[in-house]
């Protein structure tokens, strides 16, 4: 075996180990509460959510990728059904201080979704996201089932765990 092939194999093993380690950490992670407000100014807490699954969707009103994720999730039959059957709560979170911009864009989201604003940026201490959109799926006990994932992965998860 040539040295370059061995280096490639070693690198693949290393990257696989890093990926497995990341997945194992995510499997034991908990989603954590932070300061949130609804559009009417009321405080909101993750502890108030009683559905078996919660999708934390960090988004930004000016983000084109966020618009695509919103479309994908809102058009997905399995997401709509899970929300309608009270199996899933979709919680959109705008991390920012432009409340007027946020409120002007709330009509982009399905009425069954819960929309909150983190105008104190408190979620930045508890969640890693480099840029919106960022999705976290958690279970009833607030265990992170999927961390920093895609809409496609959320939909696939819901399809495989239906019923």
Q: Where do the language-model regions lie?
A:
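Bacterial Sec-dependent N-terminal signal peptides
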Residues: 1-31
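N-terminal "domain-start" segment that seeds a small globular fold
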Residues: 26-48
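Short acidic-hydrophobic, aromatic-tinged amphipathic segments that line or gate anion-handling sites
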Residues: 37, 114-119, 148-149
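Short active-site neighborhood of thiol/selenol oxidoreductases, capturing the structured segment around
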Residues: 46-67, 91
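Conserved helix-turn-beta segment immediately C-terminal to the redox Cys motif
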Residues: 52-53, 68-92
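Thiol-/selenol-based redox modules, centered on thioredoxin-like
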Residues: 81, 139-163
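Thiol-based oxidoreductase modules, predominantly thioredoxin-like and allied folds used
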Residues: 85-100, 111-121
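Short, internal strand/loop/helix patches
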Residues: 103-138
């Amino acid at each position: 075996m040539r040295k370059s092939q061995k280096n490639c194999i070693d690198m693949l093993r290393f990257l696989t180990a890093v990926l497995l380690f990341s997945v194992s950490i995510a499997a034991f992670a908990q989603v954590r509460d932070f300061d949130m407000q609804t559009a009417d100014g009321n405080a909101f807490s993750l502890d108030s959510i009683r559905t078996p699954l919660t999708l934390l969707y960090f988004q930004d009103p000016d983000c084109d990728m966020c618009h695509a994720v919103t479309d994908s999730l809102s058009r997905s039959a399995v997401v709509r059904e899970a929300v309608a059957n009270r199996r899933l709560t979709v919680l959109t979170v705008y991390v920012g201080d432009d409340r007027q911009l946020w409120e002007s864009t709330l009509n982009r989201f399905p009425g069954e979704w819960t929309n909150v604003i983190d105008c104190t940026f408190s979620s930045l201490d508890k969640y890693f996201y480099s840029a919106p959109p960022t999705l976290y799926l958690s279970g009833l006990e607030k265990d992170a089932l999927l961390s920093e994932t895609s809409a496609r992965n959320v939909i696939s998860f819901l399809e495989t765990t239906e019923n």
